C-alpha cells in the first residue's frame, strides 16, 4: 500500500467519523465550573432548593454577610428555606476566578431587582467565595458579601 492509499484511507475514516456526528467530549475549565456553581447557588437560593446548595457548601462553610454578621452552613441552608423576598431578577457578572491548586477564589457582582414597599428596589452586592477541591468536585468553604452603596 502506498502512502497515498494510506492517506486516502485515513481521510475516509476521519470524514466518516465527522459525518456520523461523533463529537469530542467537551472539557470545561475550572473557571467555567466555578462560575456555573455560583449561578446554580444563586438560582437554588431563590427557588429554595436546599439540595443544590447542600452540594455546593462544605461542612465547615462560614459566611460573613454584608451587615457584618457571620453564619455557618446550617444557618445559610435555613435562610434559603425561609427566603420570602420577591426577586424579579438576579444577575451575576464581573467574575474574576483564580485557581491555586486545590483552592479557588471567586469574585463577582450580584445585581438584584425586586419590589419593596410598593416600589422597585435595585441592590448590588460584591462577593468573594473560597472553594476547595474535594473528591473531584469544588465546594465552598467561605463567603463574604459587601453591599455596594455607590458605583
Regions found by a protein language model. Give the residues of each.
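N-terminal secretory signal peptides that target proteins for export/translocation
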Residues: 1-3
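Bacterial N-terminal signal peptides
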Residues: 8-18
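A beta-strand edge to alpha-helix "cap/lid" segment located at domain peripheries
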Residues: 24-151
